[in-house]
Swiss-Prot record:
SUPFAM superfamilies: Nucleic acid-binding proteins (SSF50249). This is Translation initiation factor 1A. It comes from Thermococcus kodakarensis (strain ATCC BAA-918 / JCM 12380 / KOD1). Keywords: Initiation factor, Protein biosynthesis. The keyword Signal does not apply. Residues 17-92 form the S1-like domain.
Amino acid sequence: MAGKKKNDRHVEGDEVIRVPLPDRSKGQLFGVIEQALGAGWMDVRCEDGKVRRCRIPGKLKRRMWMRVGDVVIVQPWPVQSDERGDIVYRYTRTQVDWLLRKGKITQDFLSGGELLF
């Protein structure tokens, strides 16, 4: 019989997870969504301690739902960089667990404490 059987497909051992990280050279930051404002806007608490009003670009808005408590990557705007930004990426629960294990974010940051880099 040609082809692989269903049982041959699962991988044994360590699972490889590819997680995009914020590009610090572009000024990107980790953030946690605090409030959904409607019309594609969210209040996001960023790792530098500031709360920014962030926009969800159309390509992300159509592809995935964003909820309060989600961990995201924020790209601050060149103008009003302390107040506004764009959401670039949303992490899944598995990816957030990986970030916690690797020390990229802390539980304090997720629960509302300040994280300053």
